[in-house]
A protein has these predicted regions:
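Conserved small-residue-rich beta-alpha loop and adjacent elements
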Residues: 74-113
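N-terminal Rossmann-like NAD(P)+-binding subdomain of aldehyde/semialdehyde dehydrogenases
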Residues: 1-83
Length: 113
């Protein structure tokens, strides 16, 4: 049985995630420095800003991406109305390195929502 969340619930979850990342950006940057000696500018450019940008793009486009798409029916299926319905598969396992980029774990999470 597919796991279904409506689009507004998904957007809400993504907005909450974005707000947490924005609120705790300095803590994330500090952790990246302490663990990997990643400079602040590099952490902002490649980790937090990239992830926030990905979140904004997903929030902006999720309704369009999830919309039912009408497609031209095949002559083999005549008479029919064909369309593509994008539905979630269910639970997702995200495998990411524990010792490197924050965004390598976050971007698949964003896409999974």
């Amino acid at each position: 049985m597919p796991y279904k969340l409506n689009i507004s619930t998904r957007k809400e979850a993504l907005i909450k995630l974005m707000n947490v990342i924005i609120k705790r950006e300095n803590e994330i940057i500090q952790a990246l420095y302490e663990d990997f000696k990643k400079p602040k500018f590099e952490a902002i450019a490649t980790e937090t800003s990239y992830t926030i940008s990905e979140l904004k793009d997903t929030i902006k486009n999720i309704e369009r991406w999830a919309k039912i798409k009408n497609v031209t029916p095949s002559i083999l299926n005549f008479p029919s109305t064909d369309y593509i319905v994008k539905e979630p598969y269910g639970k997702v396992l995200i495998i990411a390195p524990w010792n490197y980029p924050f965004q390598l774990a976050m971007c698949p999470l964003i896409a999974a929502v």
